[in-house]
A protein has these predicted regions:
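Transmembrane helical cores of multi-pass ion-transport proteins
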Residues: 1-138
């Protein structure tokens, strides 16, 4: 519902336009699409650590499609990046229900998730940035 609301109100398009304008200012022309793909992934990964992964995917998918449209790029790799990043909720017990469950039952501390989750998130980001553009061209 949130994703549809963002799409119907134009909020997704507005966020996409502003994001692309900001990246246009920072990144040279050739690398804009990959920089935006990385940005979409990183924002999604950050949100999924503090919100439900399903909610983040629903929220970010219309924005990712809008970003791709603004760039004149294929939207599929951007949506794939959202799905990969939304599923990479490793650094906190909040983003995924199983993490919350083992957090309580297993007696883990918040820092335990950070110690293991941050390196795992970095690894997933690097792999995603190498694989996504190869399998789903921008």
């Amino acid at each position: 519902a949130m994703g549809l609301a963002m799409e119907h109100t134009g909020a997704a398009a507005l966020v996409a336009q502003k994001t692309v304008a900001f990246v246009n200012y920072l990144v040279p022309g050739v690398h804009k699409a990959i920089a935006m793909l990385a940005g979409v992934y990183l924002i999604t990964a950050l949100f999924t650590e503090i919100l439900s992964n399903n909610a983040v995917a629903a929220l970010m998918a219309p924005i990712a499609i809008g970003v791709a449209a603004e760039l004149g790029a294929n939207p599929r790799p951007f949506v794939i990046a959202v799905m990969f990043a939304a599923s990479a909720a490793f650094s906190t017990p909040i983003g995924y229900q199983t993490n919350t469950y083992v957090y309580g039952i297993g007696g883990y501390k918040f820092g335990d998730f950070l110690k293991i989750g941050i390196p795992l998130n970095i690894l997933c980001f690097v792999v995603a940035m190498l694989v996504i553009p190869e399998v789903w061209p921008l």
